[in-house]
């Protein structure tokens, strides 16, 4: 019988062996994923200090890796909050270490993407990453050169320097080499920047590609959405593991105080009602609950119907005005309608759906709707057919709104949540949750009705323009003939008559 060997592997070793699940499936996807993850970290860093983001991305050619792939150096620089020097090595050299594990709306979810980009670069080029950061214009600049110890999931610090901050800079620079196929990735990368600019209209984004071509996406406003707030878990979203963790760290000695202080929107009255419902004494010490009692408590939390729904104040939707600004800036349509749904919940997690529909202008006709999908202001560019938004759009009866897929129409769907229901670690598409599907459908119906009203008005205007054109063409001739027939010298003033048949304003709809 063959001997079976058991071994433990680190988190970085796991993702080294299974990098596909984080979106680094091939050189084309990998270079796109690396840029995306670092840009999103930069956006989060700037927004956390309420500063309109200024992000600079440069991709430089370094050499050929094979017949189909090349080595590039990627540099991403931002004006965000910076990283305290003691955290820099672990923040970039330890997989699943970071600031993304609190319950609030943010682009990052797993504390994984930025480290995966550096890990991928290290695997494919065997070169270290350089991290430069400053947390304040008055503080010093810290520079680290590091690699990841894959087997131990620890940073290897190769060099550390402390520099004077003469220009009063604050932010972070990440620079490393990686293998990729930019020529194949270029359309997705440029589309990513365009869509990021659309849903973050307050950001300046500059991209320099390997051929030195400069792409600038200039902010259209300095107005930013309110930053998201950290929140407590809602009782409906709690499982046994989370409840046990809360019990381990709680300073409270009664289950009543524990419920009031560790759960979202649970006050004393609600907590007492729940404890009566579940048959637990309010004075019982939560640390003395047995495993079976913890399991039963979770089951009762799910069954209790009187918990208040999650409060969406912890969320940071883009808002109708900013969404409209972004769509107008990037798509330049003839007409745009936007709608923000009221907060809703799934599995105890609050979420808000924002939708927009744009028509005409510079939107091309492609024989189908152009669909833009976003989650927490992240563009979702891959696996479109699997996304719940696309399923809802395809299932709608657009004919009732006088809309057909061959019209120049773009549809935007944005979902923000403390926990976006992604189907994969790579954050490529959103799962088909009934609550999310319902909110998307209701939002789309609202903007479709607005578009229908616009198209109806435009039909009336076109009809009246044609009618007025006929009058304008023939009335002068009729007036001239009538003048001669009546033996008059001066023809009547037909402008008054033309104004009387002008029923609509034709300067716009």
What are these regions (language model features)?
Residues 281, 287-360:
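C-terminal extensions
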Residues 251, 256-278:
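Helix-hairpin-helix
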Residues 1-169, 173-177, 259, 266-268:
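GHKL (Bergerat-fold) ATPase N-terminal catalytic module, capturing the glycine-rich phosphate-binding loop
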Residues 22-24, 99-103, 282-284, 420-426:
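Short small-residue beta-strand/loop micro-motif enriched in glycine and branched aliphatics
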């Amino acid at each position: 019988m063959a001997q079976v060997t058991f071994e433990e592997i680190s988190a970085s070793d796991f993702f080294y062996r299974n990098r596909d699940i984080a979106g680094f499936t091939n050189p084309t996807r990998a270079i796109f994923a690396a840029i995306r993850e670092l840009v999103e970290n930069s956006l989060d860093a700037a927004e956390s200090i309420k500063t309109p983001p200024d992000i600079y991305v440069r991709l430089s050619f370094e050499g050929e890796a094979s017949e189909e792939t090349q080595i590039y150096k990627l540099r991403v620089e931002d004006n965000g909050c910076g990283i305290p020097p003691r955290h820099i090595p672990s923040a970039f050299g330890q997989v699943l270490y970071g600031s993304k594990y609190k319950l609030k709306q943010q682009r990052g979810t797993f504390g994984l993407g930025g480290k995966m980009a550096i890990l991928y670069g290290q695997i494919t080029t065997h070169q270290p990453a350089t991290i430069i950061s400053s947390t304040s214009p008055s503080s010093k600049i810290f520079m680290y050169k590091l690699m990841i110890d894959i087997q131990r999931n620890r940073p290897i610090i190769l060099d550390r320097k402390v520099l004077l901050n003469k220009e009063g800079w604050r932010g972070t620079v990440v620079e490393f080499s990686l293998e990729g196929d930019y020529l194949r990735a270029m359309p997705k990368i440029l589309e990513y920047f365009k869509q990021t600019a659309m849903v973050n209209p307050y950001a300046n984004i500059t991209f320099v590609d390997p051929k030195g071509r400069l792409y600038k996406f200039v902010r259209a406003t300095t107005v930013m959405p309110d930053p998201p707030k950290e929140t407590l878990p809602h009782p409906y979203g709690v499982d046994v593991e989370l409840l046990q963790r809360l019990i381990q760290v709680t300073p409270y000695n009664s289950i009543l105080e524990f419920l009031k202080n560790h759960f979202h929107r649970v006050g004393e009255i609600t907590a007492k009602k729940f404890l009566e419902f579940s048959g637990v004494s309010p004075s019982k010490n939560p640390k003395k609950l047995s495993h079976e009692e913890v399991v039963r408590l979770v089951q009762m939390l799910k069954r209790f119907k009187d918990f208040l729904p999650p409060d969406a104040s912890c969320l940071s939707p883009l808002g109708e005005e900013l969404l409209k600004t972004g769509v107008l800036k990037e798509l330049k349509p003839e007409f745009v309608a936007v709608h923000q749904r009221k907060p809703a919940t799934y599995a105890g997690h609050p979420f808000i759906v924002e939708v927009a529909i744009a028509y005409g202008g510079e939107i091309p006709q492609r024989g189908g709707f152009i669909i833009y999908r976003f989650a927490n202001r992240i563009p979702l560019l891959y696996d479109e057919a699997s996304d719940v938004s696309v399923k809802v759009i395809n299932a709608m009866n657009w004919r009732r709104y006088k809309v057909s897929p061959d019209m120049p129409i773009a549809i935007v769907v944005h979902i923000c949540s403390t926990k976006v229901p992604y189907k994969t670690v790579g954050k490529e598409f959103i799962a088909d949750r009934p609550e999310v599907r319902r909110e998307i459908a209701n939002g789309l119906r609202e903007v479709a009705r607005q578009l229908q009203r616009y198209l109806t008005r435009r039909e009336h205007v076109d009809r009246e323009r044609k009618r007025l054109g006929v009058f304008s063409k023939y009335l002068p001739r009729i007036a001239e003939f009538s003048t001669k027939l009546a033996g008059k010298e001066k023809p009547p003033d037909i402008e008054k008559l033309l104004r009387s048949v002008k029923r609509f304003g034709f300067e716009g709809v």
